[in-house]
Amino acid sequence: MSAPNERQTDSMHNAQSLRDRLNAAGMMIVPGAYDAVGARLIEQAGFPAAYMTGAGTAAARGFPDFGLLTMSEMVENAAVMARSISIPLIADADTGYGNELNVTRTVREYESQGIAAIHIEDQVSPKRCGHLDGKEVVSRDAFVSKIRAA
């Protein structure tokens, strides 16, 4: 395995910074954005971290939040946002884009682009926007397997 690149080093630093803040007493408010301009505004407003919204990212590209964007498209957007700020970025990784193997790759792709943390949803694929009714979730065992893979 090769030495970490600059983005991976930033990711590790931002991940540790985020972890430290999450372990501190009190609540942490993390506003969401779907592009680099929004992320910069969040940083300039003094927030400790920014969040890349999957629904906003999809909407900005003219799609509903039904998992239509690929992992590559979401990672690319997160990378642009992360490069524009010095605070940690938490990114939406939808359902992890498949099974446990896909989740492992998803984590590596986001991490390689300097993303401090991701979240994955427990919905079946194709997913529905988390704000809408009618969602179906995977079994607990299936989701635990994805978490372990991450």
Residue ranges and their predicted role:
Residues 17, 37, 76-77, 105:
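Short Gly/charged-rich anion-binding patches and loops
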Residues 13-16, 63-91, 113, 131-150:
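Alpha-helix-loop-beta-strand connector modules within alpha/beta enzyme cores
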Residues 2-32, 36-45, 149:
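N-terminal amphipathic alpha-helix/helix-capping segment at the start of soluble metabolic enzymes
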Residues 46, 114:
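Conserved functional loop/turn residues at catalytic and ligand-binding sites
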